Amino acid sequence: MQFRMTLISVLAVAVMAACGGKAKTDTGGGGGDSGATLYDRLGKKDAITAVVKDFVEERVAKDDRIKSFFLNTDIPNLEAKLVDQICQVAKGPCTYTGKDMKTAHAGMNIKDADFNALVEDLKASLDHFKVGDKEQKELIGALATMHDDIVTAK
């Protein structure tokens, strides 16, 4: 199965609140500059890339609840698409060029429990990089809109 991108993104979409944090520093949770975009407050593309790599390779790939969805997935491509998707959702300069979520996840029989496991993994990565609560909630809120296109099984 190709669980490409987002069941993430969930996460991505789900927002994963994802991405965020600066790979090297604590984003603190407040974000300080009220005029800064979520992309800026997350630490821009390098920080998003670090979070996505940790999320996919250290969390999802080792999560017995959902790792089977990714067995035949091109991981570098998945990570690149997730970075672009999160970057775009966070009002950064990236453009997501992957499939829409409904098409990407068609026939995968993804249940709420699978989606929730993915979100838990994303949250763990965001916490690992000390992404602030405000940024996590904002990102996850934006990504959560994809839930119904991803979860199709009961």
Regions found by a protein language model. Give the residues of each.
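C-terminal motif of bacterial Sec signal peptides marking the signal peptidase cleavage site
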Residues: 15-18
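Short, low-complexity N-terminal intrinsically disordered segments enriched in polar/charged residues
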Residues: 26-44
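Bacterial signal peptide processing site
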Residues: 20-23
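Short terminal or interdomain "cap/linker" segment that borders an active site or interface and mediates
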Residues: 144-154
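Heme-based O2/NO sensor domains and their adjacent alpha-helical segments
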Residues: 30-36, 49-127, 133, 139-140, ...
